A protein has these predicted regions:
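Membrane-interfacial terminal anchoring regions of lipid-handling membrane enzymes
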Residues: 1-662
Length: 662
């Protein structure tokens, strides 16, 4: 079906390659997988299976520390925070504004700090080391860690304050991080945790004594809380007593897609460098890849609207049955430490921070905020690039594109081998055991995920039959969480493949404008660095051309006959998202948000297109439609109205995208 580009692209979205900028190229360049050496991995559970867990927990633990660490810094942490110039300044300001005595506000600050602060004790750490060894050996076949990354981290800890930035796909993440650092005799991190965990009797206090400090999910306009919190984190960095660990995405990803980074804590940890209080800060992105996610069913049900269960000690004990399950392997990749000093070179003028005393709070300048935002996106990209993909990720991608009939086992194996080659060409960090026959690899993966697939008459299908609509949707959304792990590998070529199809001509400028529109529309859905449209376009051209799917001249580009299979696969990867945006827009008229969501859900159920039921997809689609001006939000007495903007007519635009015969 032909699509007129001018109908799709509002004039404000039209841009040319000459006017676009690049995004933090210091962290990301075009990758040729044949030129990049991957670090070697070590299975840290292998030794645990062959030696005493008690001896491991009670081992001599003497980690190397930051060369500038202040003696007794840990014991003086609370005192240092409460006596800080910035806290005193804010207390005095609040006292003047509210008329409340400064002593009363200071006591409130002390209470906030008492509720927040960690109290790390080695005895508790040893208890966790013993307990987690038992649990991990029961749950996982192996835990692989890149040794070179550990060596780089050990060196970084001695030279500068370190901030650990793990990806966040499971509750297991922060426990796993501390377990790994203890195994390698590295300083245990101080971890930012949500208040939800503090409410767990016994367990919450145990987490506090193993290095967790607890913060509210939202501070609102609470200046005192923000000041105590920021001073607490910055004091730890200035003193260098331990690495600070937090999740850049802010919360667990229920979809296995990277989430838009939150900037609050990143602003805080960069502030001591901006103000010249430390020479540098090292940011270490960490990628944690699970072969099978412990919470896969829980996440799928949450995405379908089932309320998240409250964290509780009793719930933890009820979850003990997972210990009898096989969750495969984990890969943990510690990335290259990123120097804030190097990142900021030529991008942030630190002289501005010397124009007023350090203790006076100030809002970040536009220049600084832009730098922090770009850094955050680039760090999440670094996490994505070092995610280790398992064979099941490829199998799930293929099965989701063949939900109705499934694939014969031999055909699935053949397709998986083809997709293995394509993903490697695109630079995927793929953990495919080449010493095994492809049929064995596929059979092993299907066995591990047998709850999600069925094999009948030599045909492999998703396990959808006779389970009821809710259970069928849970299976599909569980599978999408694995497919989503590979989206960062295929996203940019997929955007280009779709752009080529919908462009009015094969001219590069027309294709670029289509690419720019699609990228802009889906920027709530994926990690797409602001201002990097041209860089992403060039990467997509490079990858499609490299695999022979794209033929380019100076002015035009076309899909080759041999590349049609690749293009079909890539466009099918984006299809569920475009379908979801279409449904969301179709059922967003002059109704409240709740009514609209119910309408969209009902329509998706009727289609049995279960991916459209994901609350994450619907939320992102609504945000994109609002941002693009396709709808507007009007606050009324109950709920929100989302009337369409007639002149935008996005419905017809997305319809054309969806209904095009890829």
């Amino acid at each position: 079906m032909e699509v007129v580009l001018n109908e799709i692209l509002p004039s404000s979205f039209s841009c040319t390659p000459a006017t676009d900028s690049h995004c933090m190229s210091s962290l990301f360049q075009h990758r040729d997988p044949m030129l990049k050496k991957r670090d070697d991995f070590e299975d840290i559970l292998e030794e645990r299976r062959n030696s005493s867990d008690l001896r491991y927990a009670l081992k001599c633990y003497t980690p190397v520390v930051y060369k500038g660490v202040t003696p007794n810094a840990a014991s003086l942490l609370k005192t240092t925070v409460l006596q800080s110039d910035q806290l005193h300044y804010v207390v005095d300001q609040l006292s003047k504004e509210t008329g409340v005595a400064a002593d009363v506000i200071q006591e409130e600050a002390s209470a906030i700090l008492e509720e927040m602060a960690h109290r790390q004790q080695l005895s508790t750490v040893r208890f966790f080391a013993f307990t987690l060894s038992k649990a991990f050996k029961a749950l996982f076949r192996s835990i692989h860690v890149n040794e070179e990354g550990i060596q780089r981290l050990q060196q970084a800890i001695q030279e500068h304050p370190v901030v650990l930035l793990p990806s966040h796909r499971s509750y297991m993440d922060f426990l796993l991080m501390s377990y790994i650092l203890y195994t390698y005799d590295l300083v245990l991190p101080v971890i930012a945790a949500g208040m939800d965990f503090m409410g767990m009797k016994f367990v919450g206090e145990m987490l506090r004594m193993s290095g967790a400090f607890f913060i509210r999910r939202s501070f609102g306009g609470d200046k005192l809380y923000w000041t105590v919190f920021s001073e607490y984190v910055k004091t730890m960095l200035r003193n260098g007593m331990a690495p600070v660990e937090f999740f850049l995405e802010g919360t667990r990803s229920r979809t296995s897609k990277s989430l838009t980074p939150k900037l609050g804590l990143l602003n805080i940890v960069m502030d001591p460098f901006f103000k010249g209080e430390v020479f540098d800060v090292s940011l270490v992105p960490v990628s944690i890849s699970y072969e099978r996610i412990l919470e896969e069913t829980l996440y799928a049900r949450e995405l379908l609207g089932v309320p998240k269960p409250k964290e509780s000690t009793s719930g933890l004990f009820k979850a003990r049955k997972v210990l009898s399950e096989d969750y495969g392997s984990i890969h943990v990749y510690f990335g290259q430490p990123v120097s804030v000093r190097s990142l900021a070179q030529g991008k942030v003028n630190r002289c501005h921070f010397n124009l007023m005393p350090r203790h006076i709070p100030r809002r970040p300048s536009d220049e600084t905020q832009c730098f922090v935002n770009d850094s955050a996106y680039s760090l999440v990209r670094a996490q994505e690039e070092n995610m280790v993909l398992k064979p099941w990720v490829l199998l799930a991608s293929l099965l989701l594109q063949n939900q109705s009939q499934g694939l014969l086992l031999d055909e699935l194996t053949e397709q998986a081998v083809w997709l293995r080659g394509l993903s490697r060409e695109y630079g995927a960090f793929l953990n495919w055991p080449d010493h095994m026959a492809p049929s064995e690899v596929v059979s092993s993966s299907l066995s591990l995920h047998r709850d999600l697939v069925k094999i009948s008459g030599g045909r492999v299908q998703l396990a959808l039959g006779g389970q009821g609509l809710m259970n069928q949707a849970v299976v599909v959304l569980s599978c999408t969480s694995y497919r989503n792990q590979a989206l960062h590998v295929f996203l940019r070529p997929a955007l280009l493949a779709s752009a080529i199809h919908i462009a009015t001509s094969a001219k590069k400028e027309e294709v670029y404008n289509s690419f720019s529109f699609l990228r802009n529309m889906l920027s709530n859905e994926f990690i797409l660095c602001p201002g990097a449209t041209l860089q992403d376009f060039e990467e997509a051209c490079y990858l499609l051309g490299k695999t022979g799917a794209l033929q380019m001249s100076q002015q035009e580009m076309q899909v080759t006959d041999s590349g049609q299979k690749t293009v079909n696969f890539l466009t099918a990867m984006l299809d569920p998202f475009l379908q979801g945006y279409q449904v969301r827009h179709t059922h967003t008229h002059t109704h409240t948000h709740t009514h609209t969501t119910k309408q969209a859900d009902t329509f998706a159920w009727s289609l049995r297109y279960y991916e459209l039921l994901s609350s994450d997809l619907q939320k992102n689609a609504l945000a994109a439609l609002l941002r693009l001006g396709a709808i507007r939000k009007i606050k009324v007495y109950v709920g929100f109205l989302h009337p369409c903007v007639p002149e935008w007519n996005l419905h017809s635009h997305i319809n054309r995208l969806i209904n095009s015969n890829y």
